[in-house]
Amino acid sequence: MKTLVSLLLALLLTACMTIAKVEGEQVVNGKMQVQVSAAWNKVNSAWDREPYDMWTQEGVPLDHLRLWAGVPSGETLVTKPTVWFRAPGEKDPRFPTFDAALPADKLVSLFEAIYANEGVVNITRVEPTVFAGAKGVRFEFTLARRADDVILKGVGWVAVHKREMYAATFAAPRMSFYPRLLPMAEAVIRTAKIRG
């Protein structure tokens, strides 16, 4: 029954979205450019304007690449958290807010909060990296999604440049989609450049 409800909800949400193929040079929020060598599908909600771009290969419940660019201090990272299923009495979804004063390792907790709206998150690795030309961190995580009990594996990159946040996350079911699609997501991430 839980799976049926999740499927029906996913179908309803899909009906409220538009999907457009993206290739070549793409600009995220006018602040960061990426080069897309293998086509992705950009997903837009008909009603909500999120502060990130969301792309997918197989459909949002199966995989997604989110890209944030130029998020100013004090802004939330999501306007409407992804919540496929909530149990009675469960806490309200969280809307993490970027603060330019946060150290890099604390920035990871913002993304942990985003994914915790969907299920149980475990951050498995955090390491220094360069993302979009700025010093930051790369992190890995798992997500036990409440809606369908699927275990997702994810990776994220986050950096702060001139008090603005630049980030990306990729997540997919760990058994087949993640190992197959991660190289495509990483190919996009390697090309990320802050504009201006």
What are these regions (language model features)?
Residues 1-16:
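Sec-dependent bacterial lipoprotein signal peptides
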Residues 15-31:
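Bacterial Sec signal peptide processing site at the extreme N-terminus
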Residues 29-50:
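Proline-anchored loop/turn motifs at beta-strand termini and strand-loop-strand connectors
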Residues 31, 98-105, 175, 179, ...:
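Soluble non-cytosolic domains of exported or imported proteins
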Residues 36, 103-107, 111, 181-188:
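Stable alpha-helical elements in mature extracytoplasmic
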Residues 41, 112, 116, 120, ...:
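Sec-exported extracytoplasmic/periplasmic mature domains
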Residues 48-153:
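Conserved polar/disulfide-associated segments of primarily extracytoplasmic proteins
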Residues 122, 127-196:
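Short, well-structured beta-strand
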